[in-house]
Structures are given as structure tokens and as C-alpha cells.
Amino acid sequence: MNPQIQPQARYILPSFIEHSSFGIKESNPYNKLFEERIIFLGVQVDDASANDIMAQLLVLESLDPDRDITMYINSPGGGFTSLMAIYDTMQYVRADIQTVCLGQAASAAAVLLAAGTPGKRMALPNARVLIHQPSLQGVIQGQFSDLEIQAAEIERMRTLMETTLARHTGKDAATIRKDTDRDKILTAEEAKDYGIIDTVLEYRKLSAQTA
């Protein structure tokens, strides 16, 4: 298996052999996608996956800053700081970033889906998008002054998440706050109406049959 990209697999990742004029090499689906400028976020958003995604974004930009990068997303979400690290890198690189939701983009992953280049944010017909307010992981304990600090941090994260979603959806921050007070689950069409994506993709097979 090619050691260059090691996703957080929960099963044995299939590998295959490729023959070329340069010889024989062993590859896997993630490396093959990377060669096509495709990043696949298929795990929880945490420090490890964020570092992997950021590294791939920066490498692909250095290889060709004028070609689009595609990010496929099927993720339950994750930590806020990891989310913002990926988000900032997406905004930092010069290449346009297409985002495509396969399966689900929940919580932090929904923000990344919305953060793609305008006009290039997509989802498959049965994809699910979930947005809600951020939270701190674990039980909050400590002195009262520490609890105040934690409460202020939660409010800061919530405000930042609301303004970020507002920037990319066209909604105002007050609407985002109201909608994310509890879990808000959207179908692909509803996510399009909300401004999180621009297009609900058709199945390629059906498109070919009707062409």
C-alpha cells in the first residue's frame, strides 16, 4: 500500500497494481483520487483528519494553483477548532474548491460543504445536511471563573460559526442562530434552498441514458 496517504480506515483498504511506462506501482483509492485533485473527507473532523486535509490542499495548490480542487464529503462532523483549521486553509489557497456531499455533511462538515467556491457546491439527491450550534466536548468542571471562561468560549465559537454560515449561505446571522438552536436536518433540495449548496447532482447513469 502506498504510504503517502493513510486515511482513518475502519476496514482493510483495498489496493491495486498499476502498470505504466515507468513500471509497476501499488496504489489505493485515496491516492488515485488525490492524483485527480480529489480530496475525500470520509471520517470525523478531528486534529488528525484536519491535518491530512490541510496538507492535501496545500500540496494540490502548489502543484497547480489554477486548477480546481474537489472535496467529497461524507462526515458526521467533529471539533470546532479542527473545522476552522480546514476552513481557513480552504479560503487561503488560490484554487477554486468544489465541495460535494455524498451521504451526509453534519455539523462541522456542513460548514465545510457551504465553504466551497460559490457555484461549485453540490450534493447527491439523497444526501443529508445537518447544522447545529457548536459545543465543547466532555463534562465542564472547575472553579466558577473557569466555567465563565468556558461559557465565553462557547459563545465565541457559536458566533463565529453563525457568521461563517451566514457569509456562505446569504442568510443573516440571526436566522442562523435561530435555526441552529437545535439540530436542523436538511435534504439535498432543502440545503440548496438554504444556500448551503448550489446544485443537486443527477445520477451520471441516468444523465447518460437521457442524453
Swiss-Prot record:
It comes from Mycolicibacterium paratuberculosis (strain ATCC BAA-968 / K-10). Fourteen ClpP subunits assemble into 2 heptameric rings which stack back to back to give a disk-like structure with a central cavity, resembling the structure of eukaryotic proteasomes. GO terms for molecular function: ATP-dependent peptidase activity; ATPase binding; serine-type endopeptidase activity. The gene is clpP1. Its main location: cytoplasm. The lineage of its organism: Bacteria, Bacillati, Actinomycetota, Actinomycetes, Mycobacteriales. GO terms for biological process: protein quality control for misfolded or incompletely synthesized proteins. The keyword Cell membrane does not apply. The active site is at S107 (nucleophile), H132. Disulfide bonds: none annotated. Belongs to the peptidase S14 family. Cleaves peptides in various proteins in a process that requires ATP hydrolysis. Has a chymotrypsin-like activity. Plays a major role in the degradation of misfolded proteins. Keywords: Cytoplasm, Hydrolase, Protease, Serine protease. Its EC number is 3.4.21.92. This is ATP-dependent Clp protease proteolytic subunit 1. NCBIfam families: PRK00277.1, PRK12553.1. It is found in: Cytoplasm. It catalyses: Hydrolysis of proteins to small peptides in the presence of ATP and magnesium. alpha-casein is the usual test substrate. In the absence of ATP, only oligopeptides shorter than five residues are hydrolyzed (such as succinyl-Leu-Tyr-|-NHMec, and Leu-Tyr-Leu-|-Tyr-Trp, in which cleavage of the -Tyr-|-Leu- and -Tyr-|-Trp bonds also occurs). One of its GO terms (cellular component) is cytoplasm. The keyword Cell membrane does not apply.
